[in-house]
Amino acid sequence: MDDKQWERFLVPYRQAVEELKVKLKGIRTLYEYEDDHSPIEFVTGRVKPVASILEKARRKSIPLHEIETMQDIAGLRIMCQFVDDIQIVKEMLFARKDFTVVDQRDYIAEHKESGYRSYHLVVLYPLQTVSGEKHVLVEIQIRTLAMNFWATIEHSLNYKYSGNIPEKVKLRLQRASEAASRLDEEMSEIRGEVQEAQAAFSRKKKGSEQQ
């Protein structure tokens, strides 16, 4: 495909990311209206660059005419404050009627050897386009802020070392992953106190805005 064909091919994926970001951010807004803790802290999204798509297709032996079977061309990340929030968000997504969950991978219960932790869902999302309805695959990653910090660092190191991270650095990453996991556990233990403090701050902020 030339540049124009790739641009046309990626249009529905960009549309899917933007629509889902609006919908998922809307969930957080509804919790805020109710002065309740939102299991969603924030949402980000992206469409894979063409170079990354081609690299993965080569690595996974995916022919170009089957490129739509790639599950993460469109991707969203949902960040949560607490590990328990991940289960709540997961149940919300499974209950939705505007897309269908077609795959899931739990890297929290069984983290990768590198130390990577996250919960992945793949959904089939229907789009309304000028040519009619089109379904695209979107990967949704759900993780805590600590998990996301670790994953961002690992991604940067993978890029720096072209996927061949030195063993000494790998060991430090694994230790950092264990530390991040302990942090999540500790935060879960004081969840009630954290939420009370956040609620008090939110009430104070609203009060000052109304004055």
Swiss-Prot record:
One of its GO terms (biological process) is guanosine tetraphosphate biosynthetic process. Guanosine 3'-diphosphate 5'-triphosphate 2 binds at residues 21-28, 41-42, 148. The keyword ATP-binding applies. Induction: Expressed during exponential growth through the transition to the stationary phase, but not during entry of cells into stationary phase. Protein continuously expressed with a peak at 2 hours after inoculation, decreasing until 3.5 hours as cells enter stationary phase (at protein level). The keyword GTP-binding applies. Guanosine 3'-diphosphate 5'-triphosphate 1 binds at residues 46-48, 59, 105, 112-114, 120, 151-155. Mg(2+) binds at residue 72. Allosterically regulated by its own products; pppGpp simulates synthesis 10-fold more than ppGpp. 2 pppGpp molecules bind in a regulatory cleft in the middle of the tetramer in an asymmetric manner. There is a specific contact of Lys-25 to the gamma-phosphate of pppGpp, explaining why pppGpp stimulates activity but ppGpp does not. ATP binds at residues 46-48, 52, 56-59, 72, 77. Its EC number is 2.7.6.5. It catalyses: GTP + ATP = guanosine 3'-diphosphate 5'-triphosphate + AMP; GDP + ATP = guanosine 3',5'-bis(diphosphate) + AMP. Pathway: Purine metabolism; ppGpp biosynthesis; ppGpp from GTP: step 1/2. GO terms for molecular function: ATP binding; GTP binding; GTP diphosphokinase activity; kinase activity; metal ion binding. Keywords: Allosteric enzyme, ATP-binding, GTP-binding, Kinase, Magnesium, Metal-binding, Nucleotide-binding, Transferase. Disruption phenotype: No visible phenotype, double yjbM-ywaC and triple relA-yjbM-ywaC mutants are also viable. The active site is at 139 (proton acceptor). Gene3D superfamilies: Beta Polymerase, domain 2, Nucleotidyltransferase. Belongs to the RelA/SpoT family. The synthase activity of YjbM is greater than that of YwaC. Homotetramer. Functions as a (p)ppGpp synthase; GDP can be used instead of GTP, resulting in an increase of (p)ppGpp synthesis. The enzyme binds ATP, then GDP or GTP and catalysis is highly cooperative. In eubacteria ppGpp (guanosine 3'-diphosphate 5'-diphosphate) is a mediator of the stringent response that coordinates a variety of cellular activities in response to changes in nutritional abundance. Probably has a minor role in the stringent response. This is GTP pyrophosphokinase YjbM. The gene is yjbM.
